[in-house]
């Protein structure tokens, strides 16, 4: 499933130029390159109301709670082959992002990972140490619609809507059940936005 992006062609050109620079800089050390889209999403005990099917004339009812305990999901998803990493973190900050990029780097040390992500302050923190087999490629400011990872969060949260979780353990189990339904094929289908896959294959076509 490919998504058509209504953005100027300069974006595709800019990303292509950055990808070419990354390839030229690292081609001697790495023979395999992959593209990932990275993002974070907060999920908590606050009930997420959504539409529901009922008998005609019957108003849908949903047990609701107004609690704000939450966790953060850190995710990186490849629109090229569907490879992905998901980690649950207590906070969204530089320390936890460091843990995540280190785990992503270890997932395959022989693969050079180009990570497409937003301009969050902790993504650019001076004390962040980017592993040698990872390059961060930043999207234009205020453009979440350009990040394919948003589609993955939508699928996961869809499984949690209209659900009542008594505690964080129940929520964690529900998140686990939702993420187990994802696989490489579904990740690739969700995240294969043309603007980034076309740019990648234009540069890494050999």
Residue locations for each model-derived region?
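Electropositive, glycine- and tryptophan-enriched low-complexity nucleic-acid-binding patches
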Residues: 47-49, 54-110
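Short beta-strand segments
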Residues: 37-38, 114-117, 137-140
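Generic structural signal for small/hydrophobic residues in well-ordered secondary structure
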Residues: 39-41, 75-76, 82, 101, ...
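Charge-mixed, compositionally biased segments that are often intrinsically disordered regulatory tracts
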Residues: 1-67, 200, 204
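RNase H-like polynucleotidyl transferase catalytic core
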Residues: 59-66, 132-148
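Short coil/turn segments at beta-strand junctions that form active-site/ligand-binding loops
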Residues: 31-33, 111-113, 134
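C-terminal anion-handling pockets and recognition modules
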Residues: 31-33, 150-206
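Acidic/histidine-rich, metal-coordinating catalytic segments
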Residues: 111-123, 147
